[in-house]
């Protein structure tokens, strides 16, 4: 059985996208997205929060879109996969970094919010940008599955939602 390498991130940009052009002329965008988890500490009854930062890279048209429309604070939905790169530093030491290679980018802010942060979006709905099929080893998309019935009662999982640490 093949493995699964899929990441879904919903969060806010920590800074403006960094855009550069590769020698072949294709655009590359690097963004840093924050996700936060909060919960109530059982012992102190205080709200706790942990923020995680994610490095995400987009290529080609998605990189151009990120550079044009995204700004610090923009709320985004990203689908992608983890990739680890290796390079040598100035001292010849091997270095590694793991980042998310973005395949899907969707802006979640309203048009007014994007305009206030300096971005511009002529669309009326939040646009979604998918990486071209077959690029960078992407698998072809599969047909959508039938959604689960919405009239079923929620399952009792044996715990209270307020006590979940995420």
Curated annotation (Swiss-Prot):
Listed InterPro entries: NA-bd_OB-fold, Primosome_PriB/ssb, ssDNA-bd
Single Gene Ontology MF annotation: single-stranded DNA binding
Entry protein name: Single-stranded DNA-binding protein
GO cellular component terms, semicolon-separated: nucleoid
Keywords, sorted A to Z: DNA-binding
Keyword Zinc-finger: no
Residue ranges of every copy of the SSB domain listed in the record: 4-109
Assembly, per entry: Homotetramer.
Gene responsible for this protein: ssb
Region spans: Disordered: 114-166
Comp. bias intervals (Polar residues): 125-138
GO biological process: DNA replication
Organism: Pasteurella multocida (strain Pm70)
SUPFAM superfamilies: Nucleic acid-binding proteins
Coiled coil: none
């Amino acid at each position: 059985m093949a493995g699964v390498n899929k990441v879904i991130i919903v969060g806010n940009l920590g800074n403006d996208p960094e855009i550069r052009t590769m020698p072949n002329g294709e655009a590359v965008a690097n963004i840093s997205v924050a996700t936060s988890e909060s919960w109530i500490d059982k012992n102190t009854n205080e709200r706790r929060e942990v923020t995680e930062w994610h490095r995400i890279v987009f290529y080609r048209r998605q990189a151009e879109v990120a550079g044009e429309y995204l700004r610090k604070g923009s709320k985004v939905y990203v689908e992608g996969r983890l990739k680890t790169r290796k390079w040598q530093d100035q001292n010849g030491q091997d270095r590694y970094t793991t980042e998310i290679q973005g395949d899907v980018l969707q802006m979640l802010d309203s048009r007014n919010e994007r305009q206030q942060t300096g971005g511009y979006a002529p669309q009326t709905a939040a646009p979604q940008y998918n990486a071209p099929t077959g690029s960078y080893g992407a698998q072809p998309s599969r047909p959508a599955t039938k959604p689960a019935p919405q009239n079923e009662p929620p399952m009792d999982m044996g715990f209270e939602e307020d006590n979940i640490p995420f």
